[in-house]
């Protein structure tokens, strides 16, 4: 019986239930209930066959519920109690700082809080911090688990329980940065610097830095997007693939003697684990590799389920909130899929060939091994990627088959080259050409496949949810019925047919009516899609909520609608909450014309947009006068800024979509005084829909402006914010002119379809 596996999975199940279900004190009652059940089992089932296993399930389950409650009370709650106010802090810097738009941020370990962590935001002086330094001062404490009405699990899953916004008195002082404890962090930085020194091609060095250390900050945005879209981004989550490559490399370099291999490899694996940041995926991989290495020393076979359970147990004991980590869920789900399904799939894929041609059998085994690993991982991770990322990558098996073997060789060659670079850089640069060629090949595969129209499908198409459920039902039915290979062929054919139907039906939904307008739920930002007569335009795309993905949502929605090219992109103004998603849209979807206000901005947004537009072959038009263009059965009119100076909000464009006697007006972030000047400057019609300016700010929606355009409906694009958007005054002014109010923070994405002009 797998005792450790039973204990580990039972404990983990309790932690997952506690972490993912709402906290309202039920855990303590549940602990008592499970203990009573264990007591009843102790007396009632003593002579039963499964008596021992029952106790091994129930007791760890009870312990996990109590452990989570205790951890929350002792570690997280004291920090949570200080949030919402400004107070003093003393902390130790535990990683290298990163630059932000307003200065810098760094992860710190809070003194007096059981080594719990926080992220400190401060001035650019923080960039001088080193791991081990001490930082003190006053900061505004904000919970890392809650942003207004939204619960956010990302920070707590990393052991970060507060966000500290430093005041002017934040002081940095030298600490024990040279201590052995911080050696992995120093080694990680040296590793990244050596990668940049060996490979002067920024695309290659960024790729290899991500592959070797998991740090994706230097990667080309377009390349990382291509890796995500083709199912290859897992190469940058340092995991079993990387640890297996590392162990293989060490086995080739030192010896096959098991004791020596363990003595050298296990400390290096642990050091590498800390160096790359101790993400759940690398911790899981290292523990499983250690089990695999030491099993022969005890004359035992390594059991993957036991090592997987042990890894999960260790991670959740260190931080039970890690159960909410997307990285952990994907890593363990993929590994579980490979453990349970990969051998059966491999047998199924190779069993049909009975020939004796050795080269053909070798090739078949290679293909089958890669496909079985990929497909078995996808079976367990597809629901998670659908839920978290809204995507199902159709080309993942093919992209993995073509790219993953090359990634393995590039990792090993690059690792050796970097180590050699610390000894003799010229020889390392020469060896680096191997990795350069392999990385270029992988990027060629990824970018090429991303250009395929159906490389992936997106769950912004609601019919795909039913398709995915059908897919699992069909193949589970096949697995549960007697053996036979034809049933899998039939199931595959049915899956393709139903997928085609789901795509076609969703696209037909957008062919109805003369105009469809979608105000996407991008949080505190704005993005509006206009489609009419087979042509589509996008007005703005951005969000100030860092946990939102405005560009991904817009591009996914456009792909699901069947949009192959945007006729126009209109940028009302250059603030990030209206533009930071446009870069992904421009990389994923061709654009004919991008309309920009002819004003300068201090953030460099205009320059970046123009550069990317030129790279992608889009025409850039600066709007300096009233401009009208056809969009299928709709006329899209763009008005230039009506003010000659002031804030960027007041110097933006206005877009009017008119389909017959239906009019929809988008005014960006302009204030009421600018709206008033807009109707004084241009003869705007009575409109049916107003996309309310500046997310419903108290300074927007001037009453004279509203009485002039008389909207019948008002759409407010708004999310979590500290500005009080939408303000009660604005809502009352809209109601006063008879407008029905729709809000993305309450109704989600808002769709308006015009049946006739």
Regions found by a protein language model. Give the residues of each.
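N-terminal leader/targeting segments
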Residues: 1-79, 284
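Hydrophobic alpha-helical transmembrane segments in multi-pass membrane proteins
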Residues: 2, 14, 164, 221-396, ...
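Aromatic-rich juxtamembrane segments at the membrane interface
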Residues: 9, 157-288, 293, 518, ...
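Membrane-interface helix/helix-cap signal primarily in integral membrane proteins
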Residues: 60-234, 552-556, 565, 599-601, ...
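Membrane-interface amphipathic/re-entrant loop segments adjacent to transmembrane helices
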Residues: 171-178, 182, 189, 229, ...
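Core dinuclear metal-dependent hydrolase active-site scaffold
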Residues: 216, 316-324, 447-568, 614-689, ...
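Metallo-beta-lactamase
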Residues: 566-577, 599, 690-694
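Cap/insert and terminal regions of metallo-dependent hydrolase folds
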Residues: 593, 675-749
């Amino acid at each position: 019986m797998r005792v450790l596996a039973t204990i580990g999975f039972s404990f983990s199940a309790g932690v997952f239930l506690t972490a993912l279900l709402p906290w309202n004190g039920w855990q303590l009652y549940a602990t008592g209930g499970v203990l009573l059940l264990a007591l009843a089992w102790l007396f009632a089932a003593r002579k039963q066959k499964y008596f021992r296993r029952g106790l091994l399930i129930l007791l760890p389950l009870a312990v996990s519920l109590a452990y989570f409650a205790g951890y929350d009370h002792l570690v997280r709650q004291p920090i949570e109690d200080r949030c919402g106010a400004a107070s003093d802090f003393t902390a130790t810097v535990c990683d290298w700082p990163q630059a932000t738009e307003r200065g810098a941020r760094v992860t710190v370990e809070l003194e007096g809080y059981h080594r719990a962590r926080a992220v400190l935001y401060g001035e650019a002086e923080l960039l001088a911090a080193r791991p081990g330094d001490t930082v003190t001062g006053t900061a505004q404490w904000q919970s890392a688990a809650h942003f207004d009405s939204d619960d956010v699990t990302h920070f707590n899953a990393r052991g970060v329980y507060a966000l500290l916004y430093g005041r002017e008195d934040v002081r940095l002082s030298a600490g024990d940065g040279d201590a052995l404890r911080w050696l992995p962090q120093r080694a990680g930085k040296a590793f990244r610097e050596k990668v940049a020194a060996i490979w002067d091609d920024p695309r290659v060095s960024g790729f290899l830095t991500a592959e070797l250390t998991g740090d994706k900050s230097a990667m080309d945005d377009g390349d990382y997007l291509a890796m995500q879209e083709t199912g290859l981004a897992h190469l940058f989550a340092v995991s079993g693939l990387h640890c297996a490559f590392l162990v293989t490399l060490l086995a080739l370099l030192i010896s096959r003697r098991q004791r020596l291999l363990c003595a050298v490899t296990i400390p290096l694996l642990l050091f590498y684990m800390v160096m790359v940041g101790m993400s759940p995926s690398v911790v899981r991989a290292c523990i499983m590799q250690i089990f695999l290495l030491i099993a022969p020393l005890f004359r035992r076979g390594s059991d993957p389920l036991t090592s997987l359970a042990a890894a999960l147990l260790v991670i959740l004991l260190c931080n039970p909130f890690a159960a909410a980590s997307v990285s952990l869920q994907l890593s363990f789900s993929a590994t579980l899929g490979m453990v349970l399904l990969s051998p059966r799939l491999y047998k199924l894929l190779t069993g049909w060939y009975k020939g004796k041609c050795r080269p053909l059998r070798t090739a078949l085994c290679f293909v089958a091994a890669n496909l079985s690993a990929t497909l078995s991982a996808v079976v367990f991770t597809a629901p998670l990627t659908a839920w978290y990322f809204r995507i199902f990558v159709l080309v993942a098996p093919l992209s993995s088959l073509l790219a993953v073997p090359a990634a393995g060789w590039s990792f090993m060659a690059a690792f050796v080259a970097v180590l050699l670079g610390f000894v003799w850089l010229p020889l390392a640069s020469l060896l680096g050409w191997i990795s350069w060629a392999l990385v270029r090949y992988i990027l060629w595969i990824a970018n090429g496949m991303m250009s395929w129209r159906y490389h992936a499908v997106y769950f912004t198409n609601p019919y795909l949810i039913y398709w995915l459920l059908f897919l699992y039902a069909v193949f589970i039915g096949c697995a549960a019925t007697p053996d036979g290979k034809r049933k899998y062929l039939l199931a595959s054919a049915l899956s393709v047919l139903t997928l085609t139907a789901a795509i076609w039906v969703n696209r037909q939904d957008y062919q109805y009516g003369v105009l469809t307008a979608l105000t996407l739920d991008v949080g505190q930002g704005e993005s509006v899609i206009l489609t009419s007569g087979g042509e589509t335009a996008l007005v703005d795309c951005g969000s100030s909520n860092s946990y939102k993905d405005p560009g991904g949502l817009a591009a996914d929605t456009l792909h699901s609608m069947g949009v192959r090219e945007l006729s126009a992109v209109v940028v009302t103004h250059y603030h990030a909450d209206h533009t930071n998603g446009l870069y992904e849209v421009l990389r994923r979807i061709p654009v004919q014309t991008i309309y920009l206000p002819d004003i300068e901005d201090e953030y460099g947004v205009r320059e970046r947009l123009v550069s990317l537009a030129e790279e992608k072959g889009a025409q850039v038009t600066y709007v300096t006068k009233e401009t009208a263009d056809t969009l299928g059965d709709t006329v899209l009119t763009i008005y230039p800024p009506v003010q000659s100076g002031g804030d960027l909000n007041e110097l933006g464009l206005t877009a009017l979509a008119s389909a017959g006697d239906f009019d929809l007006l988008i005014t960006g972030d302009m204030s009421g005084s600018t709206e008033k000047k807009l109707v004084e400057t241009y003869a705007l019609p009575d409109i049916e829909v107003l996309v309310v300016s500046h997310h419903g700010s108290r300074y927007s929606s001037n009453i004279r402006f509203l009485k002039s355009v008389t909207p019948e409906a008002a759409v407010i694009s708004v999310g979590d914010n500290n500005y009080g958007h939408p303000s009660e005054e604005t809502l009352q002014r809209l109601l006063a002119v008879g407008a029905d109010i729709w809000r993305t923070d309450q109704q989600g994405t808002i769709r308006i379809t015009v049946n006739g002009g």
